[in-house]
């Protein structure tokens, strides 16, 4: 018994010395909070194969999460020296199983149209436009998918205003509050984000099937190649795209949207917000949008009064949590904003993985 006590005390001492927290797993084992990639048993059991995790396994992983500032789980193994270098994520699509994407803080959140935490959804991109008069405004969103590319909607890069002289001039990553120069959590000067990163545009790649003058928003997807590499940190990192064997989210289950879009009073929100709402069955969506011709490369979600993604979020990500965040859709269009019974329509990312891979380069 004395040896057991000594071991527990030693583990706690090591955790304090290394700045890690002691914890207890859901199956009542003592552990230490570490990044997943440093925990061999969890890494090998859940992430070193191509199989799709079950709902029970996903629930277990969620319960393993530590309430720490960084992304950690309760690991019963101790530490290994394997670590991810986030700056190594560059031109290829990041690998979820190598923990190169889809990770943000894991503290408890209340979702439902609320403001995000300062370091939640660090892949969100703001697209800034300049009018012919020189006025600048953020009008679309996007998502960082690797160290050089942002995924967005085609209508954010090809539309009537752009034909008339408006220009996309800037992509901003790592923004939380557009009204402040330095973003701090709850005004705490000791808990602040790194400065946002602004990028010029090297290339704009609109899907060739998108028709900006057509009656439908089919193939509403595009890529932006930034003018330089992104610097990865806790406030800027990529989202995961769906694996090839990704099972779509079933109707009735929730997905999450994020952005700086309109509030209920149609005013643009200066702070990053999130909303959670259910996926719509495809046949029900077809009935609602019978004049639009919703196709298989699109999905529908929302239709809950007061909770939806609005026009200011065009091009932003629609996501599902599979321990890490996977982008399932690109925000395309809707009927007004958060209208009861009317789902928004999103471009289905899994339908365009080959096109995305073919159009990203070094």
Curated annotation (Swiss-Prot):
Q: Domain Peptidase S1: where? A: 110-361
Q: Which CDD domains match?
A: Tryp_SPc
Which GO MF terms are attached to this record? serine-type endopeptidase activity
Q: Which residue numbers mark the site Cleavage? A: 109-110
Q: Which GO terms describe its biological process?
A: defense response to symbiont; innate immune response; positive regulation of melanization defense response; protein processing
Q: Where in the cell is it found?
A: Secreted
Which Cys residues form disulphide pairs?
23-74, 33-66, 39-75, 140-156, 285-300, 310-337
What UniProt keywords apply to this chain's record, in alphabetical order? Disulfide bond, Glycoprotein, Hydrolase, Immunity, Innate immunity, Protease, Secreted, Serine protease, Signal, Zymogen
Main location as per UniProt: secreted
**E.C. designation(s):** 3.4.21.-
Q: What Gene3D superfamilies does the record point to?
A: 3.30.1640.30, Trypsin-like serine proteases
Span of the signal peptide: 1-19
Give the positions the UniProt entry annotates as the active site: 155 (charge relay system), 220 (charge relay system), 314 (charge relay system)
Q: How is its activity regulated?
A: Inhibited by serpin SRPN2.
Oligomeric form and interacting partners: Forms a covalent heterodimer with SRPN2; the interaction inhibits CLIPB10 catalytic activity.
Described function: Serine protease which preferentially cleaves after arginine residues. Involved in the innate immune response against parasite P.bergei infection by activating the melanization cascade. Probably in the hemolymph, cleaves and activates prophenoloxidase (PPO), which functions in the formation of pigments such as melanin and other polyphenolic compounds. In the susceptible strain G3, appears to be dispensable for ookinete elimination which occurs by lysis.
Question: What family does the Swiss-Prot or TrEMBL record give for this protein?
Answer: Belongs to the peptidase S1 family. CLIP subfamily.
- By what name is this protein known? CLIP domain-containing serine protease B10
Q: Which organism is it from?
A: Anopheles gambiae
Q: What is the lineage of its organism?
A: Eukaryota, Metazoa, Ecdysozoa, Arthropoda, Hexapoda
């Amino acid at each position: 018994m004395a040896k057991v006590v000594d071991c527990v005390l030693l583990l706690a001492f090591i955790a304090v010395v290394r700045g890690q927290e002691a914890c207890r797993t859901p199956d009542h084992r003592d552990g230490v909070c570490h990044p997943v990639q440093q925990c061999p048993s969890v890494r090998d059991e859940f992430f070193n194969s191509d199989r799709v995790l079950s709902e029970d396994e996903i629930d277990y992983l969620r319960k393993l999460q530590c309430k720490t500032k960084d992304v950690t789980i309760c690991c019963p193994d101790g530490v290994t020296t394997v670590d991810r270098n986030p700056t190594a994520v560059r031109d290829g699509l990041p690998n979820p199983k190598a923990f190169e994407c889809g990770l943000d803080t894991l503290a408890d959140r209340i979702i439902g149209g609320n403001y995000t935490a300062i370091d939640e959804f660090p892949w969100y991109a703001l697209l800034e436009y300049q009018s012919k008069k020189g006025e600048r405004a953020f009008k679309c969103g996007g998502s960082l998918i690797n160290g050089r590319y942002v995924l967005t909607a085609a209508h954010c890069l090809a539309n009537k205003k752009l034909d008339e002289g408006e220009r996309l001039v800037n992509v901003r990553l790592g923004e939380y509050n557009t009204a402040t120069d330095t973003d701090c959590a709850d005004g705490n000067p000791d808990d602040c984000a790194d400065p946002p990163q602004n990028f010029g545009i090297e290339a704009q790649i609109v899907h060739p099937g998108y028709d900006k003058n057509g009656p439908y928003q089919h193939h509403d997807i595009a890529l932006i190649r930034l003018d330089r590499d992104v610097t990865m940190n806790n406030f800027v990192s990529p989202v995961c795209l769906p694996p090839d064997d990704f099972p779509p989210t079933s109707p009735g289950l929730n997905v999450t949207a994020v952005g700086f879009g309109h509030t209920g009073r149609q005013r643009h929100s200066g702070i990053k917000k999130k909303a959670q709402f259910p996926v719509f069955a495809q046949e029900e969506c077809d009935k609602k949008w019978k004049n639009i011709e919703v196709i298989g490369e699109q999905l529908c979600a929302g239709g809950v009064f007061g909770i939806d993604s609005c026009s200011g979020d065009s091009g932003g990500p629609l996501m599902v949590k599979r321990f890490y965040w996977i982008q399932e859709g690109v925000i395309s269009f809707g009927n007004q904003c958060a209208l009861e019974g009317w789902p928004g329509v999103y471009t289905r990312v899994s339908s365009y993985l080959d096109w995305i891979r073919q159009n990203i380069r070094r």
